Design a protein with these regions (language model features):
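Short, conserved beta-strand element in jelly-roll/cupin
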Residues: 83-84, 88-95
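A short, N-terminal "cap"/entry segment at the start of jelly-roll beta-barrel domains
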Residues: 1-84
C-alpha cells in the first residue's frame, strides 16, 4: 500500500471515530515531527505497538479486502502485567476481513 493511501484511510477513520464520539488519544494525531520531539515518556506507546494498523492482507486491494484498527492499550508481559488490550477495528461496507 502507498503511504498516501494509508494516510487517507487514517483520516477517514478519524472522521468516523469523531462522528461516533469515540475519542482517540491525543497521540493519534501526532506528526512524524511530534514523535521525533518526544522522549522516553512515550516509550510505552512504542514498546507496546500502540497506534494505527492498516492492512490489505497482501491483496493489493484495500477497498475489497482490508482492515483498519487502532490499538489504545496492549499488554506486554515482558515489561508489565497488563493482561489485556483495547482496540477499535473499522471496516468498510462490503469489505472482507
Amino acid at each position: 500500500m502507498k503511504r498516501s493511501e494509508i494516510n487517507n484511510i487514517i483520516c477517514e477513520n478519524k472522521r468516523l471515530c469523531n462522528e461516533a464520539r469515540f475519542y482517540l488519544p491525543i497521540w493519534a494525531d501526532w506528526t512524524p515531527e511530534d514523535w521525533a520531539a518526544k522522549g522516553k515518556e512515550c516509550a510505552e506507546i512504542k514498546d507496546n505497538c500502540l497506534g494505527w494498523d492498516i492492512t490489505d492482507f497482501g491483496s493489493g486491494d484495500f477497498a475489497k479486502v482490508g482492515l483498519s484498527l487502532f490499538t489504545m492499550r496492549n499488554g506486554n508481559p515482558a515489561l508489565d502485567h497488563k493482561p489485556y488490550c483495547e482496540k477499535i477495528m473499522m471496516i468498510r461496507d462490503g469489505q472482507i476481513t
